[in-house]
Every structure is written in C-alpha cells, then in structure tokens.
Amino acid sequence: MTKKLFIKTWGCQMNEYDSQKMADLLDSTHGYQVADTAEEADIILLNTCSIREKAQEKVFHQLGRWKNLKQDKPELIIGVGGCVASQEGQVIRQRAPFVDLVFGPQTLHRLPEMINQIKGGSSSVIDISFPEIEKFDRLPEPKAEGPTAFVSIMEGCSKYCTFCVVPYTRGEEVSRPVDDVLLEVAQLAEQGVREVNLLGQNVNAFRGPHHDGAICTFAELLEMVASIDGIDRIRYTTSHPVEFTDDIIDAYATIPELVDHLHLPVQSGSDRVLNLMKRGHTAIEYKSKIRKLRKIRPNLSMSSDFIIGFPGETDDDFEATMDLIQAMDFDLSFSFIYSARPGTPAADLPDDVSETTKKERLQLLQNRITQQALRIARNMIDSEQRVLVEGPSKKNPMELSGRTENNRVVNFEGTPDMIGGFVDVKITDVFANSLRGDVLRKEADMNLRINVAPQAILAKQTNKTDALGVAQFVPAH
C-alpha cells in the first residue's frame, strides 16, 4: 500500500520551495507520495511562516484540528517545520505533545533520519539548528512541474531590519556554491523548464563560492544561468535595495533573459521611517537605482513591499510613501499593517499608530496601487506580448493561461501543444487580475532557437598561441 504525505505550506516562495524539496526527499528515501488531504496521510507536515501577526497561534489552531487524526490513527506522524518551528522549538511540544517532529528551515534535509527515529521508538525529535548550507547537499535531484521552477540560491539574511524575524529564524546569509546552483538549473532545463525564479531572503546579496574558492557575485551568476541552454527567462526574489548594485543594473543591458519585471521591497517612502527600520538607504537612493534601471529597460514593471503603521509613522511619513508609489509607478504591492514580531528591536518601540489609522492608510495605499495597475494594464491593450504558456486557465479549462515578461496573467484560446512553450499574443481585453488575448504566432515561428552544429561553431573560432606555445581559446565576436 502506498504511503502518503500531506504538507500544508504557509508563507513565502522559499517555503513553497522547501515544501517541494521535503516531498521530493521523502519520496526518494521512503517512497511517500503526496496526498490531497491530511485525512489520508501517514505523515503530516506543517511548514510555517512567522511574518504575519499571531503566527504562533495560527499554528496551534491548525495542530488542534489534526489532534483528532492522531487519536484515530496513533501511528500517524505529525511534524512542524519552518520559521515558527525555529522560533518556538520545545514550546510546540509543550503545547501540542502529540507533535512528533519539530524542525527548522535549515534542517529539513534531516527529515528521513527524524522519521526513522520516530518509527524506531523515539517519542519526539526536535532539530532547529543552523547547519548552514548542508541541507542542499542532501536533497535529491529537482523535479520539474511545468515550464517554470524555483531555485534557492542562498539562505538567511544579515541585514537585521528592526521589524524582521528572518535573521533569527533562518540565520544569516549563506550562499550555495555556484556549481550546485548551475547544476540544479541545468537539471530543470533538461526537464523542460524555460523560466527559473532564483530565491533567497536577500537574493541579490549572493556571494557563492566557485570550486576554486573564488567568489561569484549575483550579477555574474545571472550571466551564467542565462547561458544554460533552454533557460529563456530569469526572475528573482526577494531583493534588498542596498544590494541592488550597479553591476546588477548593468546586467539588464546584456542579459535578455532577465524579464522586464522587478520586485524590490522598499517598506516606506519616508527617510525617517526607513532609518527606524534600519533599512540602510534613503528614498532618493531607491529612486535613483530604479531610474538607472529604467534607462536600460523603459518598459520595466515594478512591485514592492510596504509596512503600514510602523511605530511613529506620521501622516507626513505616509504621504511620502504614497509619493514614492506614484513616482515609481508600482503596479503591484504586498502591503501589510505593522504588528510587532517578538524578539525584534521594533517590538520595543511603542506601537502608537491606531488600528483605525493603519487600516485607513492600507486602504488608501492599495487603492493607489490598483489604479496604477489598471492604467498600466489598459495601456497593454493592442500590444503584442510574449507569453510563457503554463497550462489550462483556472477560469476556463478549455482555454490556456500564461504570463508575460511583466508578470501579467494572460488567458487565451490555444491548443495543448502550446503548453510549456512561448506564444506571441495580442492583448484584447483587461480584467481585474488578468488579461485576455489572441495568439499571433507559436514558438516555432519565432526563431527562438537556432541549432548550430559544433563543427560550425568551432570553425568560427580563432586559436591564438602564447609565448609557451599553448593555444588559448578565444570566442569570436
């Protein structure tokens, strides 16, 4: 009988990536197949997030729902992972003693051993240590599910913004070796992946070691990923403005695989609030970076993160944020009302902005973003957009759906052979969360890929011999 695994995931794309790795790992080591519901599972894992308010209580409410499953099936294994597990540790077992496993983001690779310990008679296993990058050495080959895929290139953050728990739950910045990242991308490309999304809590701070010990910057990594055959689009998240350096901006001029979309969290448009948050930059510095980038990519679309009602935020501070939103012309935001995270420096500040004011400001901000997004979408009508076809439309399974470079969902009539490839679409209509279009051409008509025999490539190269008589390969320009 097939053993079943159910994973419930809360939080960021890194958590989604981690959950997929857990599933792949337990499939390869124990043969567990993913279940659709917790009721049919032999193992239940909750991958948690500590960013939102009352994250801990949300975890215990969910565990309470699963308690009866454990009573009905005593051999059921229940595990809690992610950032809340890293924060709470032993407290989870104290409040929910029926939980078998507690593991942090950096120890998910040890799940097979933990499960074996429970099956061997251990009452519980708790491992919330920070073994840095070890987890990537123990994970199986990636499995592609469609033409897009996430690839984690680093873990943790060393910025210590005053509101953020990430350095305490995922540790400080640790970058994966370059060769490991490139191998994972190449393996995904072999399985038909056309777009990769490079992940990290502070992804553009990547400083990955080469096999010879030299350090690779994020801009250099982008160039190498773009050179992998089959990869036609590159996205990345989440970035920090301080690490969004000129070499990354310049990469947009030379790497066409980098999409015309950037998510760059700013949190506030007020220098005073940015200083309280310990963000390390001003609003004008943020604007300057984006203006440089838009000189290279005039059609760039922008999204960002905002915290509303940070301690001490005045009406003037909020207006500065609204001015920044208008100046940068953001068309998407992830905006949250501030709530203190236990253990962070900001938790010691007086939370002096009323809930009513926070909600009013949040509504104003979201309305501004929505208006800008609708205007930008309407300007796309009659334009031609290249769309990566991801599969059937969620709204109408008889249609197909995909994304433009600027991250807009487009629904259109098409044929199954288009899935996994590119189509050029004329945008005909705009809806609240999507666009509609008509297919103009398929990938076969785009000349995206030109197959050239190795002999033809070599024939174009020039070989130069140095003073020692050693031939040096020099690519032709």
Curated annotation (Swiss-Prot):
Disulphide linkage map: none
Enzyme Commission number(s) from the entry: 2.8.4.3
Gene3D superfamilies to which the protein is assigned, alphabetical: Methylthiotransferase, N-terminal domain, tm_1862 like domain
Residue sites binding [4Fe-4S] cluster 2 per the record: 157, 161, 164
Keyword Metal-binding attributed: yes
UniProt subcellular location: Cytoplasm
SUPFAM superfamilies xrefs: Radical SAM enzymes
Radical SAM core domain span: 143-375
Residues the record lists as binding [4Fe-4S] cluster 1: 12, 49, 83
One Gene Ontology cellular component annotation held by this UniProt entry: cytosol
Span of domain TRAM: 378-441
Major location category of this protein: cytoplasm
Keyword set, alphabetical order: 4Fe-4S, Cytoplasm, Iron, Iron-sulfur, Metal-binding, S-adenosyl-L-methionine, Transferase, tRNA processing
Requisite cofactors: [4Fe-4S] cluster
GO molecular-function terms, A-Z: 4 iron, 4 sulfur cluster binding; metal ion binding; N6-isopentenyladenosine methylthiotransferase activity
MTTase N-terminal domain residues: 3-120
Catalysed conversion reaction: N(6)-dimethylallyladenosine(37) in tRNA + (sulfur carrier)-SH + AH2 + 2 S-adenosyl-L-methionine = 2-methylsulfanyl-N(6)-dimethylallyladenosine(37) in tRNA + (sulfur carrier)-H + 5'-deoxyadenosine + L-methionine + A + S-adenosyl-L-homocysteine + 2 H(+)
Record text on cofactor binding: Binds 2 [4Fe-4S] clusters. One cluster is coordinated with 3 cysteines and an exchangeable S-adenosyl-L-methionine.
HAMAP family reported in the protein's UniProt record: tRNA_metthiotr_MiaB (MF_01864)
Family under the similarity heading: Belongs to the methylthiotransferase family. MiaB subfamily.
Subunit architecture: Monomer.
Function: Catalyzes the methylthiolation of N6-(dimethylallyl)adenosine (i(6)A), leading to the formation of 2-methylthio-N6-(dimethylallyl)adenosine (ms(2)i(6)A) at position 37 in tRNAs that read codons beginning with uridine.
Protein name stated in the entry: tRNA-2-methylthio-N(6)-dimethylallyladenosine synthase
Organism lineage string: Bacteria, Pseudomonadati, Pseudomonadota, Gammaproteobacteria, Alteromonadales
